[in-house]
Curated annotation (Swiss-Prot):
It comes from Ectopseudomonas mendocina (strain ymp) (Pseudomonas mendocina). The lineage of its organism: Bacteria, Pseudomonadati, Pseudomonadota, Gammaproteobacteria, Pseudomonadales. This is Peptide methionine sulfoxide reductase MsrB. GO terms for molecular function: peptide-methionine (R)-S-oxide reductase activity; zinc ion binding. Its cofactor is Zn(2+). Binds 1 zinc ion per subunit. The zinc ion is important for the structural integrity of the protein.
Length: 131
């Protein structure tokens, strides 16, 4: 996978203010406000910054958290994980492996088959519906 390397100024020009805050500065959208938190449209969720395919709607479920939740990414290579100690707690941050966009966090309280909950900001995603 070829990495996307752009300056913050370039990202700021290409993204909405809200997308820039979440994807490039690591912000979080308020729960139950994102476009995809309750979407049931079949399709593939892509990175809003670089277009990389990240999650299939078949792995999406309602976690009750207010953010889109998935039990697995399309494959392990599309997601980068790193320790996040912000806000006085330890979490695992997930980013797009291609462009380093902040997506959200992964928690060990998801459903089978993985037991994982990828809690993702809608602003980090773009849904491409299935035909």
């Amino acid at each position: 996978m070829d990495k996307v390397d752009k300056s913050l100024d370039t990202w700021r020009e290409e993204l909405t203010d809200e997308q820039f805050h979440v994807c490039r500065l690591g912000g979080t959208e308020r729960p139950f406000t994102g476009a995809y938190h309750d979407s049931k449209t079949p399709g593939i969720y892509h990175c809003a910054c670089c277009g990389e395919a990240l999650f299939d709607s078949d792995a999406k479920y309602d976690s009750g958290s207010g953010w889109p939740s998935y039990f697995q990414p399309i494959n392990d290579e599309v997601i980068a994980s790193l320790d996040d100690y912000s806000h006085g707690m330890h979490r695992i941050e997930v980013k797009c492996a291609k462009c380093d966009a902040h997506l959200g966090h992964v928690f060990p309280d998801g459903p089978r088959p993985t037991g994982l909950r990828y809690c993702i900001n809608s602003l980090s995603l773009k849904l491409v519906p299935r035909d």
